[in-house]
UniProtKB/Swiss-Prot annotation:
Designated name of the protein: Peptidoglycan endopeptidase RipB
Enzyme class: hydrolase
Gene: ripB
UniProt-listed Pfam families: NLPC_P60
Residue ranges occupied by any NlpC/P60 domain in the UniProt entry: 109-241
InterPro entries recorded: NLP_P60_dom, Papain-like_cys_pep_sf, PG_Endopeptidase_C40, RipB
PROSITE patterns to which the protein is assigned, alphabetical: NLPC_P60 (PS51935)
EC number: 3.4.-.-
Role: Peptidoglycan endopeptidase that cleaves the bond between D-glutamate and meso-diaminopimelate. Binds high-molecular weight peptidoglycan, but does not degrade it. Required for normal separation of daughter cells after cell division and cell wall integrity. Required for host cell invasion.
Biological process terms in GO annotation: cell wall organization; cell wall organization or biogenesis; proteolysis
Keyword Signal attributed: yes
Amino acid sequence: MRHTRFHPIKLAWITAVVAGLMVGVATPADAEPGQWDPTLPALVSAGAPGDPLAVANASLQATAQATQTTLDLGRQFLGGLGINLGGPAASAPSAATTGASRIPRANARQAVEYVIRRAGSQMGVPYSWGGGSLQGPSKGVDSGANTVGFDCSGLVRYAFAGVGVLIPRFSGDQYNAGRHVPPAEAKRGDLIFYGPGGGQHVTLYLGNGQMLEASGSAGKVTVSPVRKAGMTPFVTRIIEY
């Protein structure tokens, strides 16, 4: 999907308010690298049955549920803007898409700001490896099994779900979920990635050389200076504005 233009963004759909996250567009600044945050290992979920067919069915069911949850959140967001996407009878999007409806281009900037507010509402929430659902913090796996919180990819997935945009769970997949943009052209709301193929960490760009992240080294959701060391060649733009 590299360099594919998502214009306008398909939906499938938010809450939360936080002030004080800086507005502006700036080139990511140099800073010392922090500890990379790992994403979930490619292992079968602890709750999934061992039979391959049962595992596949459980995965499909989880995907359908995530799609419907995101669609409902997106309807709430656009409804708040006075945009009616249809009643309960409107068909749900297929698992192969992020939604049956689209964010109007005129509302894209509002959507980006809502994504940032939704992520910012989780400031101070603990870091939990594998943690985070579309609806909020959750227990993770392994080292995060007893901690309710977010890991890096779980936080950004939660943030975008609020406006009806369903992105993949793993940061390496999130890297290819939108249009790739040179870091010098980064805009507020773009995703910044670290490690080969974006597989080691993801953050949400705020502008002015700052980013919002679920940080393993800080142990919580926090705002940090953008680190250039280990950054991927491109940032990813999920919502065009």
